[in-house]
Amino acid sequence: MSEYLIIGTGPAGISAAEAIRKLDPGGRITLVTEEKEGYYSRPGLAYLLTGEIPQEQLYPFSRDDFQRLQLKLVFARAVQILPAQHQVVLHDGGRIGYDRVLIATGAQAIPAMLPGAQYSGVIKMDTLAEARQII
């Protein structure tokens, strides 16, 4: 049985997990994310802020979907890949083994380098937690 490790739970990570499950129904698939909310639509955050959608609609892939596809979700930050050992080191010192690993961490906004950007109340919005600071 193959062990698949996907770092990141954005669209690329979720799509990869779905594709792997189709190709290898018995494989073990683990997704690692530091995003406490799991997978949600980051583009949808703008619509959440404007009130066009409720928070529940940010989740196109539910916890039931994770269970249905037998995906293990680990809430941690991957800090190092050890290719020779086929392991990923987590921020807490834990390790996860793999046969195949995919890095699908996506993009992050770069804070603006404008006068006043360092003040409290100026928030870059990459995550649901940051959107909540604005709401």
What are these regions (language model features)?
Residues 2-72:
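Beta1-alpha1 glycine-rich phosphate/pyrophosphate-binding loop at the start
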Residues 1-5, 64-135:
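FAD-binding core/adjacent interface of flavoenzyme oxidoreductases
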